[in-house]
Amino acid sequence: MRTNQYANFPKDFLWGGAIAASQADGAYTVDGKQPNSSDVQPYLKGLSNEEIQFLEKQGMTVAMVKEGLADTTHFYPKRHGIDFYHTYESDLELLAEMGLKAFRTSIDWSRVFPNGDENTPNEAALAHYEKMIDKIRAVGMEPIITMLHYEMPINLTLTYGGWTNKAVISLFERYGKCLLDRLGHKVKYWIVINQINMIQIEPWLSLGICKDQYENMAQAEYQGVHNQLVAVAKVRAYAKTLDAELQMGTMVADGTVYPYSCRPDDVVLAMQHNRMQYFFTDVQFRGEYPKFAWNYFKENQISLEVTEDELQLLRENTMDYLAISYYFSQMVDATKNTNKADAITPNPYLEANPWGWEIDPQGLYNSLSQYWDRYQKPILIAENGFGMYDKIEAGKIQDDYRTSYLGDHIEQVGRAIYDGAEIIAYCAWGPIDIVSCSSQQMSKRYGFIYVDIDDEGNGTRKRLKKESFNWYKSVIESDGAQL
């Protein structure tokens, strides 16, 4: 290990780990659960990582969703996860050995309201999640709970058209109120919707919309996220009537880009690209739609259905903290790219993992600094991690590539704190191996704990500590002073 030159983390800093129900829980048909948006994504055997990621970005059609529901041939990894639904007690005890001070996970909407539009919740699901949260607290961790992390009930996608339908606002509001009523006295930190800005990268998982249902997909995406923003504001308003001390956060996947060069066209495109990423957080922290967003909508033939009551609700219900995920930085070249979230160019100065995710610790420092300067709101790092193939040799997994990545990024978190940013938590993504969100693979591993399951669901399910397990334990014990 090495000494962190920016070892100035506050004593109440939350060193944690994060997973999602859709990638970990499994128990696909247990306790009344119905399918959700993640359950219809198959593992695409025989394809390269590049091919898998290309197909994932293409989105889903109604036919693909229905085929997924009826399919008995292919393997759907997220239906099985790592069976965390049944193993959470022992898994949390194992994670607690590292000294985690916080644990982030999500509640599956399709368990609590299996079809999304029921009048009453599923008690079996609520009882399960209450017991899980009790266990998180019992082992000494602060629960950080996400209400929606890519677990939209399939019925709401096929019957209602996903988040483009304003009826879904009230359905989600009912769900959110239900969680707060049952669990609000046990959970201080809530993330209402995971990565709310991923509408152009993952429209199916983010919004539950099928690409063949709309001629203008951008129109559907931004109408969908407007409805999400309204729903978040409604849930936040209700939370504050229950307990003013509840911390209601919004979350984005960091999409900050660099210009390819100092050529003015590159610099301006990067600025425009970044502003449309700040759009989501501008609304939720400044309470208003920025003028540049209205200009963008007009230029792209996007006409939103927005009411004055909704705009007033947004003004009155700004969020308490910003949660971000950060894995890599991005770059734009005006000769090749447009002002669209996935229009990016590889950075020749950075190395990447086998999935093309570029490694840029200073990019995290840059993004944290930009967010802090813009909003002056507490920041919670909800996800940061390094997906890689792990190999067992002589009964051990030597994953120094993971500790190197995480150590370099944690140092940059300390650097942002040194500059004055208020950062309250760092949650390593996937502290125990789970199914990859973007590729449906188990072999894309992030954890400090290895789970013996392969990409096709085979394996003993046994847990094995990697070398990084003791490394992260030492990081926490030293409050980030030793990396």
Name each region found by the language model.
Residues 80-93, 114, 125:
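Internal amphipathic alpha-helical repeat/solenoid segments
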